Amino acid sequence: MTDNNHYENNESNENSSENSKVDEARAGAFERFTNRKKRFRENAQKNGESSHHEAPSHHKKEHRPNKKPNNHHKQKHAKTRNYAKEELDSNKVEGVTEILHVNERGTLGFHKELKKGVETNNKIQVEHLNPHYKMNLNSKASVKITPLGGLGEIGGNMMVIETPKSAIVIDAGMSFPKEGLFGVDILIPDFSYLHQIKDKIAGIIITHAHEDHIGATPYLFKELQFPLYGTPLSLGLIGSKFDEHGLKKYRSYFKIVEKRCPISVGEFIIEWIHITHSIIDSSALAIQTKAGTIIHTGDFKIDHTPVDNLPTDLYRLAHYGEKGVMLLLSDSTNSHKSGTTPSESTIAPAFDTLFKEAQGRVIMSTFSSNIHRVYQAIQYGIKYNRKIAVIGRSMEKNLDIARELGYIHLPYQSFIEANEVAKYPDNEVLIVTTGSQGETMSALYRMATDEHRHISIKPNDLVIISAKAIPGNEASVSAVLNFLIKKEAKVAYQEFDNIHVSGHAAQEEQKLMLRLIKPKFFLPVHGEYNHVARHKQTAISCGVPEKNIYLMEDGDQVEVGPAFIKKVGTIKSGKSYVDNQSNLSIDTSIVQQREEVASAGVFAATIFVNKNKQALLESSQFSSLGLVGFKDEKHLIKEIQGGLEMLLKSSNAEILNNPKKLEDHTRNFIRKALFKKFRKYPAIICHAHSF
């Protein structure tokens, strides 16, 4: 509606608008305007001017383009407008545009000015969404990204970021083996590529202290040593691992970092940024390079009400986003989960209810690194007057370090040893323990199978398993659940939604991270291929062009510069196997042999041959394992012996006189004979001697 229409409305409804001072003012303004117009026409008639003289040009109707206003009044009103413009210019505020077309008839000029405002704001928003366009696209600088673990799998995270002269390694984690890797407790990344580039590695950069990010550090330092940068908790837990491995002297490589304080590491400038996750003191990384800024989120969720009241440093992330980020590497673990991940503090009401209603002992099992989860459980144990027994080596160690470093504060008098549990009534005891993943050597498993020295599960026990099974551990978790239920314990697991929350961002948190960082290029990390592929779709929905996203797998090498992202090669990657009881690596060939034995059995042959007669001696020995039953073994051995007799008769002197060739000749025959009979390739143990 135009200003004139406002005035006409108010004049016709003057009596009904008396209670409004604003309406009265407008009506008065219209009356004064009408009187001025009337006097103007009367003066014009007295001066002999045309009686149909038009009103000043700024009141002319815009649909009369041929009607020219009087020059005198045109100049007069031009002066008025110029004066108004000068006055506005002198009082102009940055970010504010004054409207000049206030009193004109119609809305064309008014809307033009508003449209200019729309265009200006749209331009500002587009520039705000794409600050990375400030980067120098002519720069020849680039960085190379090489994941050695954590892509195509859950866990085992390790990544190399390098320039031609310098490199950093982000995290060094372990993962759990799938079922069937007999005698293998953990997997660690293959360090071969690090040996190739060792002369330019400036440091190991740790994002947080979970096993899938620090578990491989002692094995790495047995082979290579570099400065190791991290927050106090990360270094504390790594230091404890080094003690167990006899590497205490390598603590001299540790560098304690301060968050929000960029430091130089080789050619990189790195800042640790506080992030919330399921372990204390987690960090994202801002890595400044000559090519541009890289943000690595580490594992994260955006928890606004964390237990320690230290939420994610969104301001610092946004700070780098506004400056312009070339590349974002972001956690993909929960990329299939819609919405947001609940806060760690939401567990409290469920814990409160369970502890309040428990009639006997409460046994709570979770990841030993989830210190805030353990802390909350202990707080409710104290609230309901229970003594706390912490059982399990890793649980005791992590809790002690967190207390000593001042991350948590708990009264020492509330704690008892495992051998003191029996001295207290069941309803006055809380046991915090390891074993949430069904590990056969864990305290919970040994309690459930009556193998623990001091504690066995009772029918009145409440067992809270406050964790989800890591992929690959489902069968182990199911086994321990079966043992607990057979003991008639009450088990709180997945049916209680509020006793466990994830430490990883769901889709809405991933979107917020993408919107804060506004990267030009995006590499989703941490997860199997289906996780990073889903994260890619989320990034596209947040405005990252599909051509600027690459889905990596372990061993891929991707080069990124201000104007491009491309795969440039593939390096050898894989896993090394570790026996966690001896802390020793297991050769790949040993694991393969174990798989052969488990899947197809073993056949052993020690033969003695008379070269002249080309015949087996009676002292030859044969045995099998996992092929046939005891009754059928004699028949199988007789078949193999008969076949070998025929083989020796047709063998030439060169084979019979060479023990190595005779052994290979015998092994190949047995292998083929067993495959023909069983359609399997058992492990063959063969020794041959000729006389």
From Swiss-Prot:
Q: How is it modified after translation?
A: Acetylated on nine lysine residues. Some of the residues are acetylated by multiple different mechanisms. RimL is partially responsible for the acetylation of Lys-323, Lys-397 and Lys-649. HPB8_1270 homolog is partially responsible for the acetylation of Lys-323, Lys-397, Lys-511 and Lys-649. Acetyl-phosphate-mediated non-enzymatic acetylation pathway takes part in the acetylation of Lys-134, Lys-323, Lys-397, Lys-511 and Lys-649. Acetylation of the remaining residues Lys-140, Lys-337, Lys-547 and Lys-634 occurs by a yet undetermined mechanism.
For this UniProt entry, which segments traverse the membrane? none
Q: According to its UniProt record, where is this protein located?
A: Cytoplasm
Q: Which domain of life is it from?
A: Bacteria
Q: What GO molecular functions are on record for this protein?
A: 5'-3' RNA exonuclease activity; identical protein binding; protein homodimerization activity; RNA binding; RNA endonuclease activity; zinc ion binding
Keyword list (alphabetical) reads: Acetylation, Cytoplasm, Endonuclease, Exonuclease, Hydrolase, Metal-binding, mRNA processing, Nuclease, RNA-binding, Zinc
- Which residues are listed for Zn(2+) 2 binding in this entry? D212, H213, D299, H526
Basic and acidic residues bias (residue ranges): 41-57
For the region Loss of region decreases protein stability, still able to interact with RhpA, but has decreased RNase activity even on ssRNA, give the residue spans: 1-132
Effect recorded for K611A: No effect on homooligomerization
How would you classify this enzyme at the top EC level? hydrolase
UniProt effect for mutating K649Q: Acetylated mimic with no positive charge. Has a significant increase in homotetramerization over homodimerization compared to wild-type. Decreased exoribonuclease activity
What happens on changing K140A? Answer: Altered cell morphology, but no significant cell lysis
Phenotype when inactivated? Essential, it cannot be disrupted. Depletion experiments show only slightly retarded growth with an increase in levels of at least 1 mRNA (ureI). RhpA remains associated with the ribosomes and polysomes.
Signal peptide positions (record): none
User: What is known about regulation of its activity?
Assistant: Catalytic activity is regulated by the balance between homodimers and homotetramers, with homotetramers being the active forms of this enzyme. Acetylation allosterically regulates the homooligomerization state and hence the catalytic activity.
From the UniProt entry, list the residue stretches annotated as the region Disordered. 1-89
The record's section on Pfam families has: Lactamase_B, RMMBL, RNase_J_b_CASP, RNase_J_C
Consequence the record notes for mutating K511A: Altered cell morphology and significant cell lysis and cellular debris
Stated consequence of mutating D299A: Loss of catalytic activity
Describe its assembly: Homodimer. Homotetramer; dimer of homodimers. Interacts with RNA helicase RphA, might be a member of a minimal RNA degradosome complex.
The entry assigns this protein to a family as follows: Belongs to the metallo-beta-lactamase superfamily. RNA-metabolizing metallo-beta-lactamase-like family. Bacterial RNase J subfamily.
Notes concerning its domains:
The first 132 residues are not conserved outside of Helicobacter. Important for protein stability; a depletion mutant expressing this truncated protein accumulates more ureI mRNA than a depletion mutant able to express low levels of wild-type protein. The truncated protein still stimulates ATPase activity of RNA helicase RhpA. The C-terminal domain is required for homooligomerization.
Job of this protein: An RNase that has 5'-3' exoribonuclease and endoribonuclease activity. Degrades 5'-monophosphorylated ssRNA and dsRNA, considerably more active on ssRNA. Association with RhpA significantly increases the dsRNase activity. Degrades RNA substrate with hairpin structures at both ends with low activity, but presence of RhpA significantly increases the activity on this substrate. Stimulates ATPase activity of RNA helicase RhpA. Involved in stabilization of mRNA but apparently not rRNA.
Name the UniProt record assigns to this protein: Ribonuclease J
Q: Which gene encodes it?
A: rnj
